[in-house]
Curated annotation (Swiss-Prot):
Keywords: Antibiotic resistance, Calcium, Hydrolase, Metal-binding, Secreted, Signal, Zymogen. Changing residue 3 to M: In strain: CA4098. This is Penicillin G acylase. Changing residue 254 to S: In strain: CA4098. It comes from Priestia megaterium. Ca(2+) binds at residues 177, 341. It is an enzyme of class 3 (hydrolase). It catalyses: a penicillin + H2O = 6-aminopenicillanate + a carboxylate. Changing residue 524 to Y: In strain: CA4098. One of its GO terms (biological process) is response to antibiotic. The keyword Calcium applies.
Length: 802
């Protein structure tokens, strides 16, 4: 991959060829100056922050109003009013787990003055454009509003905060404790208590000391290998898990149809001055939130006296998550810390609306919600639902037959507005101390990254993490009777963090932050086989690195067959032991060693370049089935997400590598299983496709931006151009913090402007970054005024006093 050539070509194109500037709107010297670059990205210049944030909301609404409206409705639970009863269950879950307007307003009232004022101004900016659009709907309302025959509403601070809190809560939310309990209960029924617990401890380990970490430290923690404190749960947990699981599947499906972001992942890297080839700190961002058109991320430049920042953030958020200000670059990835607990509530046999807590029967809080639902005939009806809440949180399942209910607690509950404020403060910070102060106020589980002009870097696993009762196993639900409540929260200073690490860099792909840190029910995310090794390997293979080096590492990670990292060498070693018995084994060894472990298509012929990749894919699937299908039998389906997880297959590696496990998973030599899979797959490929690997090449898998439909029509009308599938960030920023400020390159596909005219015409910037993204080309990261003016295509002004 000729990344340096590609990067230089696009930057050369942007800066050498003159732009035809268009001056539009009011006098460009008044109000907020809006400079649109040649990719449609708005760079806002205001005389004060209030005007700046109002303009921020305005341009976002101008570019993405329909998307904003979908986010608002999706998060407040009013989608069924527009799209009918199929979306009522999604609305119900949004209301069940959400807050009332009164509760949100109370949180906003508790914020510091500046964040509170600027959130309000951001909302005013959105409403300003809504007012304009309602006066001129034919020109200023995008086609979707006309198509579905409804109008946007004005926004308030409550809407802005709700969009943030509900979407971020979903990223932190899970019901894995119920799923784990279901797995354990079914294993116990089949194998008995002793054997099932050994199996469970292998499937959902507490702490894997071999797991790669973002903070490199000496020594290893002790491995937790037994379930000495497993609490006894009701048999009703199986039914509850299945019910909640189906509800969540429906929620995910309908949310994706509406174009709401659900996928959360992300990778990032920061490099300090000692590891950087230029001596300047470097930062890479790769948020993974899915691929749709318009995208979930919105790029903008913000400029006011004493404040300059450029980057991207989620649509509807009044802050930048991936970018830089004058002093430092910042990024974030999902932390996957243990911030969600499920509590098993014991119900009163005489009154199922009461639950036992600290020796007394308590009444559940009861709340009625009304939904306006559009019928098939277009008429609207009112549907009323009753929701219950315990001291632990909303009731997500209630089994009156077994007198058990399950409620859900989030450690950050009630502090979401504070977290939004903390992110805004991080944007405004001028040094590491101020950034760290903002990080200390953030209560949801993320990883934050910092790289400044001095060459310093820092990493924080931010969030508010409970101190749980030591008698409780965090992997399954907690009895809600009051004896096992949280004892407080871990102090921020004890959260994993590092400043200027000795190895000179920090990388993360949602992996374990540090050796001692565990994440309860999601412990199987952090194992010995983990995808972050792609970034670690790339960094360790190089001395000092540049942004181009980091881009090459990201390219490798995006196309890697992740199982090849550990399992390919295991296969080669076993083949080498048996090569004298079959000449095909020598051939396989040669091809495996030649293979770069990537599933790429550099010659653009529609097939993966390496035929051996087809062999390895099929070998892995065959091998995985042999390891677990017989032992787990009927439970293979509910455990496959763990044993063949997208982050890694650690249990399989431990078995095949003959490491210690609690349960004996195979009764034959591991090498025999490896060879059986090899022989079966080799015979199949050679008989069906030919003797040599060149004949085994597979058609590439493709992806599109916006393949999920919105009631039969692509979300935002999508962009159906297929490109090769990549395990890559939804956008990428590569930033070098030079002594004079940030520079670098970035890409935010498919494009900046999601507005579609009433007649179906799309903007030139609807998907103009899509092909670039597919070809690993980038646009220059524009920060200083001189470069922005060179790339300017349109200049206008917004008068905030009107």
């Amino acid at each position: 991959m000729k990344t340096k050539w590609l990067i230089s070509v696009i930057i050369l194109f942007v800066f050498i060829f003159p732009q035809n500037l268009v001056f539009a709107g009011e006098d460009k010297n008044e109000g907020v100056k809006v400079v649109r670059d040649n990719f449609g990205v708005p760079h806002l210049y205001a005389k004060n922050k209030k005007d700046l944030y109002e303009a921020y909301g305005y341009v976002m609404a101008k570019d993405r109003l329909f998307q904003l409206e979908m986010f608002r409705r999706g998060n407040e639970g009013t989608v069924s009013e527009i799209f009918g009863e199929d979306y009522l269950s999604k609305d119900e879950q949004s209301r069940r787990d959400g807050y009332s307007n009164k509760e949100i307003k109370k949180m906003i009232d508790g914020l510091d003055r500046q964040p509170k004022e600027l959130i309000a101004k951001f909302a005013e900016g959105i409403s300003r454009y809504v007012n304009e659009a309602l006066k001129d709907p034919d020109d200023k309302l995008s086609k979707e509003f006309h198509e579905y025959q409804f109008l946007p509403q004005k926004w308030t601070s409550t809407d802005v905060v709700r969009v943030y809190m509900v979407s971020m809560t979903y990223f932190m939310d899970n019901h894995q404790e119920l799923k784990n309990a279901e797995i354990l209960a079914k294993l116990e029924h089949e194998y008995g208590t002793e054997v099932s617990r050994k199996m469970f401890d292998d499937l959902v380990w507490k702490n894997d000391p071999s797991a790669p970490t973002s903070i490199v430290s000496e020594g290893k923690p002790k491995r937790d290998s037994s379930s000495q404190s497993l609490q006894i749960l009701s048999s009703a947990v199986i039914k509850a898990s299945e019910k909640v699981g189906k509800e969540r599947e429906n929620f995910v499906q309908t949310s994706e149809e509406l174009g709401l972001p659900l996928k959360i992942g992300s990778n990032a890297a920061i490099v300090g001055s000692e590891k950087s080839a230029t001596g300047n700190a470097l930062l890479f961002s790769g948020p993974q939130v899915g691929f749709v058109a318009p995208g979930f991320l919105y790029e903008v430049g913000l400029h006011a006296p004493g404040f300059d920042m450029e980057g991207s953030g989620f649509i509807g958020y009044p802050f930048i998550m991936f970018g830089a200000n004058n002093h430092f670059a910042l990024s974030a990835t999902a932390g996957y810390g243990n911030v969600t607990d499920i509590f098993e509530e014991k119900l009163n046999a005489k009154n199922s609306s009461q639950y036992l807590y600290k020796g007394k029967w308590r009444d559940m809080e009861k709340r009625k919600e009304s939904f306006t639902v559009k019928g098939d005939n277009g008429e609207k009806k009112t549907v009323e639902k009753i929701y219950y809440r315990t001291v632990h949180g909303p009731v997500i399942s209630r089994d009156e037959t077994n007198k058990v209910a399950y409620s859900k607690s989030w450690s950050f509950r009630g502090t979401e507005a504070q977290s939004m404020s903390a992110y805004m403060k991080a944007n405004w910070a001028k040094n590491l101390k101020e950034f760290e102060n903002a990080a200390s106020e953030y209560t949801m589980s993320l990883n934050w990254y910092y790289a400044d002009k001095k060459g310093d870097i820092a990493y924080y696993h931010v969030g508010r993490y409970p101190v749980r009762n030591s008698k409780i196993d965090e992997r399954i639900p907690t009895p809600g009777t009051g004896e096992y409540e949280w004892k407080g929260f871990i102090p921020f200073k004890e959260n994993p963090h590092v400043i200027n690490p000795k190895n000179g860099y920090v990388v993360n792909w949602n992996n374990k932050p540090s050796k001692e840190w565990v994440n309860g029910e999601y412990s199987f995310y952090w194992g010995e086989d983990n995808r972050v090794q792609q970034y670690i390997n790339g960094m360790e293979a190089r001395g000092k690195v540049t942004l181009e080096d980091i881009n090459e590492i990201n390219y490798t990670a995006s196309f890697a067959q992740l199982r090849a990292n550990l399992f390919k060498q295991l296969l080669i070693d076993v083949l080498d032991k048996n090569k004298s018995t079959n000449g095909n084994y020598i051939y396989l060894i040669e091809k495996l060693e030649e293979w770069n472990n990537l599933k790429e298509d550099e010659n653009k012929d529609g097939y993966y370049d390496a035929g051996i990749a087809a062999f390895f894919d099929e070998w892995w699937n065959n091998l995985h089935d042999k390891l677990f299908m017989d032992e787990l039998g009927d439970f293979y389906g509910i455990t496959k997400e763990i044993t063949d997880h997208r982050y890694g297959a650690s249990l399989a590696y431990k078995i095949l590598n003959k490491e210690s496990t609690n349960y004996k998973w195979v009764n034959v030599d591991q090498e025999k299983i490896i060879m059986e899979s090899t022989n079966e797959v080799l015979a199949k490929l050679q008989s069906e496709k030919g003797l040599k690997a060149e004949k085994w090449r597979m058609p590439i898998k493709t992806m599109t931006f916006g393949e999920k439909s919105l009631i039969g029509i692509p979300h935002g009308y999508g962009s159906m151009t297929p490109i090769i599938e990549m395990n890559r960030g939804s956008e990428n920023h590569y930033i070098e913090m030079t002594p004079t400020g940030p520079s670098g390159f970035n890409i935010t596909p498919p494009g900046q402007i999601g507005f579609v005219k009433k007649d179906g015409t799309i903007s030139d910037h609807y998907d103009d970054q899509l092909v670039m993204f597919a070809e690993w080309k980038f646009k220059p990261y524009l920060f200083n005024k001189k470069d922005i003016n060179k790339a300017a295509k349109n200049v206008s002004a917004l008068n905030m006093s009107k």
